[in-house]
Swiss-Prot record:
EC number assigned by the record: 3.6.4.13
Record function comment: DEAD-box RNA helicase possibly involved in RNA degradation. Unwinds dsRNA in both 5'- and 3'-directions, has RNA-dependent ATPase activity.
Motif Q motif in this chain: 2-30
Protein name per UniProt: DEAD-box ATP-dependent RNA helicase CshA
Location of the Helicase ATP-binding domain: 33-203
GO biological process: response to cold; RNA catabolic process
Primary gene name: cshA
Family classification: Belongs to the DEAD box helicase family. CshA subfamily.
GO cellular component: bacterial nucleoid; cytosol; ribosome
Residue ranges of the region described as Disordered: 428-525
Enzyme type, top EC level: hydrolase
Pfam families for this protein: DEAD (PF00270), DeaD_dimer (PF25399), Helicase_C (PF00271)
Amino acid sequence: MTTFRELGLSDSLLQSVESMGFEEATPIQAETIPHALQGKDIIGQAQTGTGKTAAFGLPLLDKVDTHKESVQGIVIAPTRELAIQVGEELYKIGKHKRVRILPIYGGQDINRQIRALKKHPHIIVGTPGRILDHINRKTLRLQNVETVVLDEADEMLNMGFIEDIEAILTDVPETHQTLLFSATMPDPIRRIAERFMTEPQHIKVKAKEVTMPNIQQFYLEVQEKKKFDVLTRLLDIQSPELAIVFGRTKRRVDELSEALNLRGYAAEGIHGDLTQAKRMSVLRKFKEGSIEVLVATDVAARGLDISGVTHVYNFDIPQDPESYVHRIGRTGRAGKKGIAMLFVTPRESGQLKNIERTTKRKMDRMDAPTLDEALEGQQRLIAEKLQNTIENENLAYYKRIAEEMLEENDSVTVVAAALKMMTKEPDTTPIALTSEPPVVARGGGSKKRGGNGGGYRDGNRNRSRDGRGGDGRNRDRNRDGRNRDGNRDRNRDGGNRGRRGEGQGRPGSSNGRGERKHHSRKPQA
């Protein structure tokens, strides 16, 4: 293994890294940092959880001249949660060097951001829409930027941000260094690399398994209309400490979180339509344990850094295998065990195979529990806890009352009563969820999700992003945009499913009038 001291980093950064408890670099860090410190462009292919933030963050921070009062680096991330997380990580790493980091994203007061920009941050971490908004307002100037980082570029493609990224890249000096990180390399991302990067070093970290071995993965074949009852039975049997349930759309998240509360579970949902304050409030309650189930869309959960998640339930199978990897990566962290459950409807078996091919791992099948099995499962879990208490706790204070009870009742009856009191009785509250269409795998895979991102610029970007899938089908995630003050960053998942194809620009057009705009670093042939 390579230590950070062997990578040629400055003393102030080494001090920060060591104070954070890190000594050895991960493979992506060991391969990326030396090339990046030399000023080379980098294409890094690595999954989440490989340490890629430090892989680009350390050389980015190393290059910053803190005596200059100008923006010297920008990191572009697909979601506000990831922007916040990356900003926090860079702050920790750059603390001893006193690098000023500023996250900017939609949903936050733009005037507050403008005031912060006037304090001359060295590095900006933000979502594409809000960065571009500040560029257009002349509140963010990039003439001194030396390094641009594109984090999770494939996800930004899926969310329709490609044109925004191109516009940002044309606004920075041509001599800038680009560090592009992406789990996959679809053609539009390759074209970005060809146009805006110079002889990039391609670094790919291969893993025998894409997903972590300490995550137990199961799938259950369940009919759409029976999924909710199966979910509640699993929650009763498994009694997770903290659980995340993934739904495919905002409507699903809203309905599912409400239904769980009706059945007596402490649950709340997060998705793109919630205000930033509301989302942060929900996450805080989840981290504190005042809610036990977090229901989320893929995009809303991107970048979440929550420790202690024991179970992930994929209530809806994801549109693409990469999203599955990101979903289950919320559990099984820091050496702890995690459990991931995937609900598969009869027509989704092909998508299950796609996921298994991507993860290079066969999932174990689990039968959906019946009502009787759910009750018995609860009782066995309670019995285990009772046995653990018998073996490890001091019970002297409780024995006198126990002995009095045994004088009047036999021991089996007493234990049975205790089990009954601690068992959650079946709740038959009627629940009606709106059915979601199945994800049917086509052509042996599901990675093709919509070309170059399409869409409009010049004020027309706020139209619906429904139906972007190339095959004319509604993509179910519905990336409907919002206004140009950056709030469209808020709503990249779910919503308004009926407006398929509305507001679609011609492929390659950028202003709603069919005029093509080329933003290329290379001379046009």
